Swiss-Prot record:
Binds 1 Mg(2+) ion per subunit. The keyword Metal-binding applies. The keyword Magnesium applies. Homodimer. Belongs to the HAD-like hydrolase superfamily. PhnX family. It is an enzyme of class 3 (hydrolase). It comes from Vibrio parahaemolyticus serotype O3:K6 (strain RIMD 2210633). NCBIfam families: HAD-SF-IA-v3, phosphonatase. This is Phosphonoacetaldehyde hydrolase. The gene is phnX. Involved in phosphonate degradation. Keywords: Hydrolase, Magnesium, Metal-binding, Schiff base.
Amino acid sequence: MSNSPIQAVIFDWAGTIVDFGSFAPTSIFVEAFKQGFDFDIDLEEAREPMGLGKWDHIQAVGRIPAVDKRWNEKFGRSMTNEDIDAIYAAFMPLQKAKVADHAEPILNAVEVVNGLKDKGIKIGSCSGYPREVMDVLIPVAADYGYQPDYVVATDDLPQGGRPAPFMALKNVIELDVTDVKACVKVDDSAPGIFEGHNAGMWTVGLLLSGNEAGLTFEEYQAADEATLEKAREKARAKFIKSAPHYLIDTISDLPEVIVDIEQRLAAGERP
């Protein structure tokens, strides 16, 4: 076991470690709006606020101008908290039923994580999923070989979830990390990158495996370089405001970033 200056890497779940393209939550948001109110949203609208907790996500979808316009046309008002509660109530059982189908780790994720563990680096994690969904996902992911040292769900903490730093900092506390600048936050969405910045960590955004590119694994594998570059540009645009320290395609590219951060820490740099 080598002695890395990095104490912990904190991963998001869907689109980062499991569920290439982050399709489990996206398709179910579409279904929940339909089931709750017979109201149609498309996949792009469902993806727009990804990374937030799921109640906040539903609220944010309702605030998208085009969605708000259609909602007003159908119901004569903007979406209320009671409406959000009803959609969330439809979302939860759908998500619990489907999340295990999207629990397979992204290519090389388990190998990369195990390589970090071999260096003595602790593995934290946090998710926009609520705890009752995580309770379904965690054991299935473990069967595939992914076992982080700690997991925080978006509704675990009274302070709330992203983009605030609380979930990341809960990992710091539970993993006995002594210095936030010795931590790396890896995520496929802007709110998760803001979370890492707000917690004082190095941040790594994923361009192609997650929500922002919205590719299936099959599309990713079949794509030519021009198609991938177009997807990268689409994702980069979503990450501009959150300004991650690093942008890479997928978790497969993380080891080189870890080496670079180790060198920067050894030279006295901070995030």
